[in-house]
Amino acid sequence: MAHSKEIPSFRWTQSLRRGLSQVHPTVKTDVLKDAKLIADSIDFNQVSQVQRALRKNKRGEEDLNKLRDLNKEVDRLMSMKSIQKNTIFKIGDLGRDELMELASDLEKLKNKIKRTESGPQGLYMGNLSQLQLTKRSEILKTLGFQQQRGAGNGVVRIWDVSDPSKLNNQFGSMPALTIACMTVQGGETMNSVVQALTSLGLLYTVKYPNLNDLDKLTLEHECLQIVTKDESSINISGYNFSLSAAVKAGASILDGGNMLETIRVTPDNFSSLIKSTLQVKRKEGMFIDEKPGNRNPYENLLYKLCLSGDGWPYIGSRSQILGRSWDNTSVDLTKKPQVGPRQPEKNGQNLRLANLTEMQEAVIKEAVKKLDPTNTLWLDIEGPPTDPVELALYQPANKHYIHCFRKPHDEKGFKNGSRHSHGILMQDIEDAMPGVLSYVIGLLPQDMVITTQGSDDIRKLLDIHGRKDLKLVDVKLTSDQARLYDQQIWEKFGHLCKHHNGVVVNKKKREKDSPFKLSSGEPHCALLDCIMYQSVMDGKMVDEEPVALLPLSLLFLPKAAFAL
């Protein structure tokens, strides 16, 4: 596709929605919870002051401080936010060609955005003092030039501040904030605002809503009168009632629709998101258009994904993030030696992040080396293979085990699994160290034979991580056989794992011939299940307590210490 060709913007948006459909959770409840808290807690006199400051053509340090202070308060109140997370993609996370493509597109995007922010037709709008701006106007007038004031109906907004980096990530709308401001400042009920924005969101599933659409919907929903009809401009804040902010809010509170706005990035799905995005890009012929101007759908998605590897790219608070996308996401094409193959697969989840240090990697490598590839090695997981929450490796011959956890990205599915299977509570694993589970799988000795009880999910998990070389032996015990020593194992070795504190509700038969019924109300722990299966194979309880190869301090992020 020639880059001068008109971009089929909405078609690209629809294609990206479909290509990333696996990561569109329903977030309406979370958005409205944050909106209610903001509406009840924020000082709307401060909001009015910030809105007034942002309407000025020339803004200074005091205006920026007001904006940053209010953003900090909103960020404190919100549960939906993006956090600082610097990500380095390496070979194994993505293929070499994908890494090069990502690096190239981020560089092009950087150039485009910097040119756009420097002003139309080369007019610099950045960190000039008021004296310099006045002097420049006089020089241009003397030389016979008309001073440019922006393209079309757009308004040039000049910030006269000492540190331009403080402007980063202070702008952009958030649905929770938009809903709260429309409710309080519009004198409306939140329910009427939600209904109106839902109508906009439904329209957005088939087209980009425009001002004519807004006028027609306003006849049905009077609260939409507060939405401004002004042209969008650079550095528009989340406190402005723009049409784009209203549409984004509407998209976020739809149930279904595969809206990009509801994407959540986690350390474990980041690489697969990038991989899927690049696949859609190639299929549709998308590209980075380096000419200054608004971002096309691919540019917008790439920028938002790469700003932080942990959070809500479109709808969360991001005002506490430092740097830009090209600062926070980088590519390293240096191939590091590995014990086992870690080839990129379709779902590409072998993400390496800054919070798994070289020292931590060395500890994990040393632990995996202690597993004997010639002896029986049990492997069990809890959670689905695409979103596992627990993994255990147990070797009876040397009494060694590796046991690690992972925070899930599908919280609804996790709660269901907790209730009917593993009994893990989110509060017990929310601080699990990202990347450990994938790194352990990647280091397993090549062509090793692994013993399992049920192999389908484990086979899929290994394939996702590029470990098709690993062989599985499924002992295929019945449910009753597998859990013969259930209670005895929990009584003897339950102290080895303290992360199954939920109540497990047995699945009951609906009919007489129902083939499935759990025979125990004990939770399923990957580690204790491995010990249990070995006991069944031995025909007696395992006697000796196994030894952990990974320290607990490596498995979880350190808790923040608070001093009064």
Swiss-Prot record:
Q: Which residues form a coiled coil?
A: none
The protein's UniProt keywords, in alphabetical order, are: Capsid protein, Helical capsid protein, Host cytoplasm, Host-virus interaction, Hydrolase, Inhibition of host IKBKE by virus, Inhibition of host innate immune response by virus, Inhibition of host RLR pathway by virus, Interferon antiviral system evasion, Manganese, Metal-binding, Ribonucleoprotein, RNA-binding, Viral immunoevasion, Viral nucleoprotein, Virion, Zinc
Q: What class of enzyme is it?
A: hydrolase
Q: Which GO terms describe its cellular component?
A: helical viral capsid; host cell cytoplasm; ribonucleoprotein complex; viral nucleocapsid
Q: Which GO terms describe its biological process?
A: negative stranded viral RNA replication; RNA-templated viral transcription; symbiont-mediated suppression of host cytoplasmic pattern recognition receptor signaling pathway via inhibition of IKBKE activity
Binding residues annotated for Mn(2+), in chain numbering: 380, 382, 529
Region of interest (Binding site for the cap structure m7GTP), residue spans: 54-236
Detail the disulphide connectivity of this chain as listed in its UniProt entry: none
The GO terms describing molecular function are: hydrolase activity; metal ion binding; RNA binding
Q: What is its main location?
A: virion
Q: What Pfam family is a match for this entry? A: Arena_ncap_C
- Which residues are noted in the entry as Zn(2+)-binding? 390, 497, 500, 525
Q: Where in the cell is it found?
A: Virion; Host cytoplasm
Site feature location: Important for exonuclease activity: 457
Q: What is its EC number?
A: 3.1.13.-
Q: What's noted about domains in the record?
A: The N-terminal region is important for the cap-binding activity while the C-terminal region contains the 3'-5' exoribonuclease activity. A CCHE zinc binding site is present in the C-terminal region and may thus contribute to the substrate binding and/or the specificity of the exonuclease activity.
Q: What does this protein do?
A: Encapsidates the genome, protecting it from nucleases. The encapsidated genomic RNA is termed the nucleocapsid (NC). Serves as template for viral transcription and replication. The increased presence of protein N in host cell does not seem to trigger the switch from transcription to replication as observed in other negative strain RNA viruses.
According to the record's subunit comment, the protein's assembly and interactions are: Homomultimerizes to form the nucleocapsid. Binds to viral genomic RNA. Interacts with glycoprotein G2. Interacts with protein Z; this interaction probably directs the encapsidated genome to budding sites. Interacts with protein L; this interaction does not interfere with Z-L interaction. Interacts with host IKBKE (via Protein kinase domain); the interaction inhibits IKBKE kinase activity.
Give the record's family classification. Answer: Belongs to the arenaviridae nucleocapsid protein family.
What this protein is called in its record is Nucleoprotein
* Species name: Machupo virus (MACV)
